[in-house]
Amino acid sequence: IGCHVMFYEIDMVEEYLNSVHLALQDIENKENVKVEMMWNLSQYFEECESGEKLFEIKQRINDLENKYGFYSLFYEQNDKPYTMADYRRELNNQCNECDYVIWGESDCLMPRQMFGVLEQLKEHSNQQGIHRFIATFGIRKMWDESWKVLEHPEFTNKPYYSMDTPEDTKLAESSPWSIRYTMSQKEMDEVNAKTSDLDVEMIAYPKFDGSGLIISSDLLRTGANIPPAVYMNGDDSSFLESCRLHMGENYRQYVIRNI
């Protein structure tokens, strides 16, 4: 599992790291999970306010490393851009080292049940002869019906707030089912604690965004990846089309709706 972090995201990323740390607590073979962080300290797009501030950020990274024990990479060139798309393209190339590649994101919380669920999926997919697939966890209420298949059962029948008006903006930022609401680890744990049996649906068409995306390594070995021309927005949608191209009529996506 790998995550690209810009230097100005340093104050928010610990929640993500803590969620991965908690997910690791419930598995025995922790040594088989590689947690990687790409720290982008480049000032190509945005300048750090001072050299002193950049030093503080590096110290903070060191503190987080000592606390959570992840593997760090750094990008520090100021004359050449490096983006999340660049990192995820490289992360996908680690497919020969593992069963899955997972796209972390600095503002995404990973569920505690993640690794246990993935072990179950691996066992099931091997039994069924399904080796190339995507897996996604449940998401909150989205803006149109095309996302309904991915929405968590607790949120799918809730209203969507568009933030077009001050009233809708207030509702969007205060309603737990809204994608604009900042859900805490505790709140996510409470939702997931209600699940006793997994609600897993298989879909035969690609539908996902980039946060928390789980990719089987056998799919990546076919060549599915983010095209080199993509370097800013669109890494998830371009990868979606690459998956569609490489799997064709055999596209498979596990949707774990109630986690």
Question: Where does each model-flagged region fall?
Answer:
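Short, well-formed alpha-helical segments that are part of the catalytic scaffolds
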Residues: 9-26, 50-53
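Active-site-proximal specificity loops/subdomain of glycosyltransferases
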Residues: 46-98
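A short, conserved alpha-helix in the catalytic core of glycosyltransferases
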Residues: 207-208, 212-213, 218-223, 230-257
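Conserved catalytic core of nucleotide-sugar-dependent glycosyltransferases
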Residues: 92, 111-217, 221
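Active-site beta-to-alpha loop of glycosyltransferases that engages the nucleotide-sugar donor
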Residues: 5-18, 43-45, 79-82
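Short beta-strand-to-loop acidic/aromatic patch adjacent to the donor-nucleotide binding site
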Residues: 98-111
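Short beta-strand/loop segment that forms part of the nucleotide-sugar
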Residues: 31-47, 76-78
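Active-site acidic Asp-centered loop
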Residues: 42, 104-107, 138
